[in-house]
């Protein structure tokens, strides 16, 4: 038996035609542009048309105008510096350059000893001047302030014996005592006599203390009334004044 033949081409053609009609409608509809962008675009078109109507386009700029624009561009850094007060105004035909020599070629041997084995044939400069960097020169004033601050914080006499320092030492907490006074106190307690911190029985020699006190003129003491240094005495040995008082009483 023969089956009935079904024709399918007619339905496919109708579907294809329907798709083509939808595409044509989409192409014919203009895209939706937001109102803000549309306004900006209209302003740009208006300005371009005005420039074209005046004949002042990009291709019609005169040579004088180009030169003026170039001069204004070159002088812009100078004008900014002038307005900020960094330096005085200079002409556009003047350029100033500053070269900083951070490593001067100075002969090290001649500077340290005054003698160089190469003699006059040395390629380095024979100079014994003191060269310092700019930041070092700017910090020279801090040296005096540091010493004055140290003098303010250091008592001009020993806190334990109330006398002048003999073989001064410096504790870990930064306080100064006589060497003998500190040794005798450590046998009793390790706490600092000034702040009460634990010194652990350790102290360093304070060699710069004598220089600081001499620079500060003893903080009110004249050099004449400064007694000569006495050697540290043992814990059981009496002082010289005590011996005299004992002899007078006897």
UniProtKB/Swiss-Prot annotation:
Pfam families attached to this UniProt entry: zf-C3HC4_2 (PF13923), zf-CCCH (PF00642)
Amino acid composition bias (Basic and acidic residues), ranges on this chain: 72-82, 241-250
InterPro entries documented for this protein: CWC24-like, Znf_CCCH, Znf_CCCH_sf, Znf_RING, Znf_RING/FYVE/PHD
Superkingdom, taxonomy of origin: Eukaryota
Gene Ontology terms, MF aspect: DNA binding; zinc ion binding
Organism: Eremothecium gossypii (strain ATCC 10895 / CBS 109.51 / FGSC 9923 / NRRL Y-1056) (Yeast)
UniProt keyword annotations, A-Z: DNA-binding, Metal-binding, mRNA processing, mRNA splicing, Nucleus, Spliceosome, Zinc, Zinc-finger
PANTHER family documented for this protein: RING FINGER PROTEIN 113B (PTHR12930:SF0), ZINC FINGER PROTEIN 183 (PTHR12930)
Region spans: Disordered: 44-89, 213-250
A GO CC term attached to the entry: Prp19 complex
Family matches, as CDD domains: RING-HC_RNF113A_B
Zinc finger (C3H1-type): 101-129
Lineage: Eukaryota, Fungi, Dikarya, Ascomycota, Saccharomycotina
Compartments (UniProt record): Nucleus
Function comment: Involved in pre-mRNA splicing.
PROSITE patterns according to UniProt: ZF_C3H1, ZF_RING_2
Gene Ontology process terms (BP): generation of catalytic spliceosome for first transesterification step; snoRNA splicing
SUPFAM superfamilies: CCCH zinc finger, RING/U-box
Oligomer and partners: Associated with the spliceosome.
Keyword NADP: no
Family the UniProt entry places it in: Belongs to the CWC24 family.
Protein name per UniProt: Pre-mRNA-splicing factor CWC24
């Amino acid at each position: 038996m023969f089956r009935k033949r079904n024709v399918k081409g007619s339905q496919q053609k109708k579907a294809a035609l329907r798709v083509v009609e939808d595409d044509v409608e989409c192409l014919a509809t203009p895209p939706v542009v937001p109102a803000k962008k549309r306004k900006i675009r209209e302003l740009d078109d208006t300005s371009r048309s005005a420039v074209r109507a005046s004949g002042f386009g990009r291709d019609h700029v005169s040579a004088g105008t180009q030169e003026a624009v170039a001069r204004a561009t070159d002088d812009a850094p100078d004008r900014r510096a002038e307005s900020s007060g960094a330096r005085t105004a200079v002409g556009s035909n003047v350029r100033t350059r500053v070269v900083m020599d951070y490593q001067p070629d100075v002969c090290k041997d001649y500077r340290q000893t005054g003698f160089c084995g190469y003699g006059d044939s040395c390629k380095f400069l024979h100079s014994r001047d003191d060269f310092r960097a700019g930041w070092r020169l700017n910090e020279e004033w801090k040296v005096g302030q540091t010493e004055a601050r140290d003098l303010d914080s250091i008592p001009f006499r020993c806190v334990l014996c109330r006398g002048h320092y003999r073989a001064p030492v410096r504790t870990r907490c930064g306080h100064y005592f006589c060497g003998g006074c500190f040794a005798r106190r450590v046998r009793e307690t390790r706490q600092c006599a000034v702040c009460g911190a634990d010194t652990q029985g350790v102290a360093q020699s304070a060699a710069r203390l004598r220089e600081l006190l001499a620079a500060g003129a003893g903080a009110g003491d004249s050099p004449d009334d400064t007694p000569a240094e006495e050697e540290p005495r043992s814990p059981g040995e009496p002082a010289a004044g005590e011996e005299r008082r004992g002899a007078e009483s006897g």
